[in-house]
Amino acid sequence: NVQGFSETKSYQVYATFDNIGGLKVRAPLKVGGVVVGRVSNIELDPKTYLPKVTIAINQEYNKIPETSSLSIKTSGLLGEQYIALNVGFDDGEIAMLKDGDKIVDTKSAMVLEDLIGQFLYGNKEDKKTEGETNDAAESH
């Protein structure tokens, strides 16, 4: 007896990303490689012009702290994209995600072309940022 995706009880959360790469509707949401939900909708936020992704999380996983974060990953080198859920800390006072919540901490997809460009030409911005980070760390 295979239960269809639409029959599974779930709650919806959403998140915005700078770049979703090739992420598609029905792409899996995984925690440690285990599928706990799926992308249910992708649209462009009309105010920010950033991709807004709606995710249906299976109801059985209803104890996910709101301190959790999302990152878009790729299965293998050229495989399908999915969203990895990094479960946040829970100190007993942190609220759990519920229907309609927004996950704020997101990391965009690494686009293969960008990675190749960084490898071939170097990324001057990263080097500048590293120097600034080191200066900031030394001053504290």
Segments and roles (model prediction):
Residues N1-S10, Y14, K24-V25, K73, ...:
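Extracytoplasmic/periplasmic terminal helices and flexible tails
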Residues V13-F17, I55-N58:
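Short alpha-helix capping/helix-loop boundary micro-motifs
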Residues D18-T54, P65, I72, E80:
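Short beta-strand/strand-turn micro-motif
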Residues I20, N58-E60, T106, M110:
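Short, surface-exposed acidic/glycine-rich loop or hinge patches that mediate macromolecular interfaces
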Residues G33, S40, Y49, A56-Q59, ...:
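Solvent-exposed, non-transmembrane amphipathic alpha-helical segments
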